[in-house]
């Protein structure tokens, strides 16, 4: 840990189409090999498809999907006296968003649909309906934390 000063988080510019910082972060997570315009095209196409399917606008549907995937608790390994315990800890808000976005992108990449935009649209619509792989991942993390609640006093 540095002794001089703590460096603050970088300010992220909102995306050009919707003006949302969350969406800009999502584009950055989806981006591969620095191809931002490709990632933006995929995300915007997926949001367009999502808006056609649901009665909400694209950004609202995206935020509902993200909200359903955000974890509140996770487990961290903690070594105490030669044995390792999975200690449940609360997830900070910035990390909640980051994990949710990462899980949605991972789940979309594993799907078997034709294009990435379609995969992403399907995963986002599943997440908005509280189903799908990303939501299952959140449920698994919550289940692990619930199962290891006995070790919560090892929190640091």
Curated annotation (Swiss-Prot):
An MF annotation (GO) of this entry: rRNA binding
Entries under Pfam families matching the protein: Ribosomal_S7
Record's keyword terms, sorted: Ribonucleoprotein, Ribosomal protein, RNA-binding, rRNA-binding, tRNA-binding
SUPFAM superfamilies: Ribosomal protein S7 (SSF47973)
GO-annotated cellular components: small ribosomal subunit
GO BP terms, alphabetized: translation
Quaternary organization: Part of the 30S ribosomal subunit. Contacts proteins S9 and S11.
Function: One of the primary rRNA binding proteins, it binds directly to 16S rRNA where it nucleates assembly of the head domain of the 30S subunit. Is located at the subunit interface close to the decoding center, probably blocks exit of the E-site tRNA.
PANTHER family: RIBOSOMAL PROTEIN S7
The family this protein is said to belong to: Belongs to the universal ribosomal protein uS7 family.
Protein name (database record): Small ribosomal subunit protein uS7
Species this protein is from: Enterobacter sp. (strain 638)
Taxonomic lineage of the native organism: Bacteria, Pseudomonadati, Pseudomonadota, Gammaproteobacteria, Enterobacterales
């Amino acid at each position: 840990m540095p002794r001089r000063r703590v460096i603050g988080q970088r300010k992220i510019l909102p995306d050009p189409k919707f003006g949302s910082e969350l969406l800009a972060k999502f584009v950055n997570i989806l981006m591969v090999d620095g191809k931002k315009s490709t990632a933006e095209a995929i995300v915007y196409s997926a949001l367009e498809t999502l808006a056609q399917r649901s009665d909400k606008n694209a950004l609202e549907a995206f935020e509902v999907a993200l909200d359903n995937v955000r974890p509140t608790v996770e487990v961290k390994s903690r070594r105490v006296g030669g044995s390792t315990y999975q200690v449940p800890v609360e997830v900070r808000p910035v990390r909640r968003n980051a994990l949710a976005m990462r899980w949605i992108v991972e789940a979309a990449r594993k799907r078997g649909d034709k294009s990435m935009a379609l995969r992403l649209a399907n995963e986002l619509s599943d997440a908005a309906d509280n189903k799908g792989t990303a939501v299952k991942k959140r449920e698994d993390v919550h289940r692990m934390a619930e199962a290891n609640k006995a070790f919560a006093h090892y929190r640091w």
